[in-house]
Amino acid sequence: MQTGMTRACLSAAFAGVLAAVLAGGVLAQAADPQVGTWKLNLAKSTYSPGPAPESATTKIEIAGAGTKIIVDQPQADGSTRHWEVTANYDGKDYPVTGNNPDADMVARTRINATTIQSVYKKGGKVTTTQTSVVSADGKTRTVTTTGVNGAGQTVNNVAVYDKQ
């Protein structure tokens, strides 16, 4: 009889610990300040070499241990860049799909609670590095991009996004 009670107690304790761990993971993901819909604030952004996109919207949502990112950037020539990536924050390469001329893979790493670093590659070669920082109030996301774009031009962009 005591063995049955011991098993029941251990099972209940294990279930409680498992529930706490899972809830903690969900809460941590829900609190990720990168998650949300972000609209480019052109007045606060700088693009070198340019031209800047006409506008840009980035949607970031939780996906497993990382995020799914959906980017739409209408361009001055009337075209739209649309690309997506689902990646964990583990520094491993994940495919970039859509029409991003500068990348076909990305590796993402969480630096701290508000900062993500993304290393973009094209054909196995690093093209650009992005650092995405969310402000303390959670209303602004600043993305600094450095490197060389698909056209071989040196890139030094600071894109400021407002949370929608």
Roles of regions detected by a PLM:
Residues 5, 21-31:
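Compositionally biased, disordered extreme N-termini, encompassing classical targeting presequences
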Residues 11-25:
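Bacterial N-terminal signal peptides
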Residues 1-10:
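N-terminal secretory signal peptides that target proteins for export/translocation
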